[in-house]
A protein has these predicted regions:
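A short amphipathic helical element positioned immediately N-terminal to and/or at the very start
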Residues: 35, 39, 77-83, 344, ...
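Feature of multi-pass inner-membrane transport and sensor proteins
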Residues: 16, 35-37, 160, 203-204, ...
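Polytopic alpha-helical membrane proteins, predominantly small-molecule transporters/carriers
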Residues: 91, 214-215, 223, 363
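The alpha-helix within a helix-turn-helix
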Residues: 210, 483
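Short glycine/proline-centered loop/turn elements that form peptide/ligand docking sites
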Residues: 202-205, 475-479
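Membrane-water interface segments at the C-terminal ends of transmembrane alpha-helices
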Residues: 44-75, 85-200, 228-248, 276-295, ...
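Transmembrane alpha-helical segments of polytopic membrane transport and secretion proteins
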Residues: 1-53, 124, 294-330, 568-578
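Glycine-rich helix-loop "coupling/hinge" segments at transmembrane-helix boundaries
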Residues: 245-271, 519-548
Length: 578
């Protein structure tokens, strides 16, 4: 009987093994296809976020795909000319800027952060926040102020020749060292702010333990504070280098050739949009290398999450105290006080006579672009923040991360890629459809405000997403759940519960985007519609002609507007420490 049952048992075993294998294969397929399957098994309330996030991520990926496709057709004659005359200098200048600005912002930002956060000296309390004010000055404004001041025909050298004779001559300000110094003074606040926050957040017990063990302030800084602050310092240096690579206005003032100026000259000199896109892809590659290097240098370090403290650990006295005060005052004067005073002088001498109808038009154009870009960008960032909160699936998280990559794209790269994509759409879709419908058959997307607003959206969506995500994270899930239990849902839930709580973060995000759009030069210069000039474009036109005094009026306007988010940043920082 047992022998008779053996075939049946073997059949059952084989079937069970086959079923087990099928079950394993099914589980493996579910694990490997989660991003595709999760949409179908998600709750309907979560499923609606997928198409929105995918569309937003696609808008950010559009410039990247266009840059890759631009290599399908290469103009050998133009590239031969560029390689023989431009590329070696572009690569050398870019490497020089990366090394010089990277070292400079690190030394300057870390030294100032250490002094103002851990040391006590005369003037520390107001220098602590005053050193953040250079955030308000665009790089191209500080560049033309320094060139106008220190050039051979400027007031400084003219005065020195009157005092010491005609033979006295300072080193050329329009040099590699000059542009590096200006970019260091503009971008050191990134390192200063993040390093200062990291130093303040470090545990007081560690530093006191180092003092008990006989470590000097320098040894405690080098062995304890600096390694703990390395992630924050690395992030600040990466931001400074990204802004350096994306800069167009400052290097144009100094006649210093970089990839951004080469993109502009290729576009308007050779009239080759595809070659400009290929140069933009090389610039983007350099940006990615910088970001990868920052991540590798940071390693597995973790920033401290302790509460910031407000009391200094080291009380400087005598010459060291006044040396610390003098160093901080010198940086503050060079980066903010002297440039602003010189702008005021130029405004009174010449700039005030430009207060006419044309300047009113510049203000209106600038305000329109800033307000529209802020509304669109904040709205899209709200969608991403809510999608991340309501449907925290792998696909949504990946889509939100992709959508936030736009800030790493320089404005010139975005301009070239979007214009190339819109040129293709006009040629292959808009013009044929318009002609078929009996229209004029003219391009509608190329050179339109929609293209410029799309560039602003892609570049500054990260700026808006950060404050909104932080504000949304502070809202406890119990609040909307209680509102739903009372019958409040849909749009009423958003306007009655979420919006009042998100209002401070929303206003902060809108203000940050508004100010960044006002100061954005390369994307606005390359993509603006014909006759649609802004304050940044006006500054570029005047500085290109050496009209420093006439550029003072729009420059002062941008500086005053740029002070608004900086003041808010200072207030939040003071509130956290107190």
């Amino acid at each position: 009987m047992i022998r008779a049952a053996e075939p049946l048992l073997s059949t059952l075993k084989q079937g069970r093994c086959a079923a087990y294998r099928r079950l394993c294969l099914r589980r493996h397929s579910l694990r490997t296809t989660v991003p595709f399957r999760e949409f179908f098994v998600a709750h309907p309330a979560q499923r609606r976020w997928y198409p929105l996030v995918c569309v937003i991520a696609a808008l950010v990926l559009l410039p990247l795909s266009v840059l890759l496709l631009s290599w399908q057709s290469i103009d050998g004659q133009i590239w031969s000319h560029l390689w023989d005359t431009q590329m070696p200098r572009l690569l050398a200048n870019t490497l020089t800027l990366i090394v010089g600005v990277g070292i400079g912002v690190t030394l300057l930002g870390v030294s100032l952060a250490w002094l103002t956060s851990l040391c006590e000296f005369p003037g520390r309390r107001w220098l602590d926040w005053a050193l953040m004010l250079p955030f308000a000055i665009p790089a191209y404004v500080l560049a033309f102020v320094f060139v106008g001041l220190l050039d051979f025909a400027g007031p400084v050298q003219t005065l020195l020749r009157e005092w010491f004779g005609m033979g006295l001559r300072l080193p050329r300000v329009r040099s590699t060292g000059g542009v590096i110094i200006v970019l260091i003074l503009v971008f050191y606040p990134y390192v200063y702010l993040l390093a200062r926050t990291a130093f303040l957040a470090q545990g007081k017990g560690l530093m006191e333990a180092a003092r008990v063990l006989g470590q000097s302030p320098w040894q405690a800084f080098w062995r304890v504070a600096l390694p703990m602050a390395r992630p924050a310092i690395g992030a600040g240096v990466a931001l400074a280098l990204m802004e350096t690579l994306a800069d167009f206005g400052a290097v144009s003032v100094f006649n210093f050739d970089t990839f951004t100026t080469a993109i502009y000259k290729t576009w308007y000199g050779f009239f080759s949009l595809s070659t400009a896109a290929q140069l933009a892809s090389l610039l983007l590659l350099v940006v990615m290398v910088v970001l990868y290097g920052e991540r590798r240098a940071r390693g597995a370090s973790r920033a401290s999450n302790e509460r910031p403290r407000g009391k200094a650990l080291y009380h400087l006295s005598g010459p060291m105290a006044w040396l610390a005060s003098g160093w901080c005052l010198l940086v503050f004067a060079c980066a903010f006080v002297i440039p602003v005073l010189q702008l005021v002088v130029w405004f009174w001498q010449r700039g005030r006579f430009d207060l006419d109808e044309r300047y009113t038009g510049l203000i209106l154009h600038t305000l329109y672009l800033g307000i529209m870009a802020a509304l669109i960008t904040v709205s899209v960032a709200l969608v991403l923040a809510f999608a991340r909160r309501q449907a925290p699936t792998p696909t949504i998280r990946a889509g939100v991360s992709l959508a936030n990559l736009g800030y790493a794209l320089p404005g010139s790269v975005l301009a070239v890629s979007i214009m190339l994509a819109f040129s293709y759409l006009d040629r292959e879709l808009v013009i044929p459809v318009s002609s078929w419908l009996g229209g004029a058959g003219k391009p509608l997307l190329l050179g339109s405000l929609s293209a410029l607003l799309l560039a602003y959206l892609v570049r500054f969506i990260t700026v808006a997403y950060g404050p909104l995500e932080n504000s949304l994270a502070r809202i406890r899930p119990s609040l909307p759940e209680a509102a739903r239990s009372l019958g409040v849902s849909g749009p009423r839930l958003f306007f009655k519960v979420y919006l009042p709580l998100l209002l401070p973060g929303t206003l902060s995000a809108a203000l940050l985007v508004f100010v960044d759009v006002l100061k954005e030069m390369p994307a606005t210069l390359l993509m603006r519609p014909f006759g649609w000039d802004t304050l940044a474009v006006r500054i570029f036109e005047m500085t290109s002609e050496g009209e420093w005094a006439r550029a003072s009026l729009p420059a002062l306007t941008l500086v005053l507007v740029g002070l608004l988010p900086v003041i808010g940043l200072i207030r939040r920082s003071a509130h956290r420490i107190s």
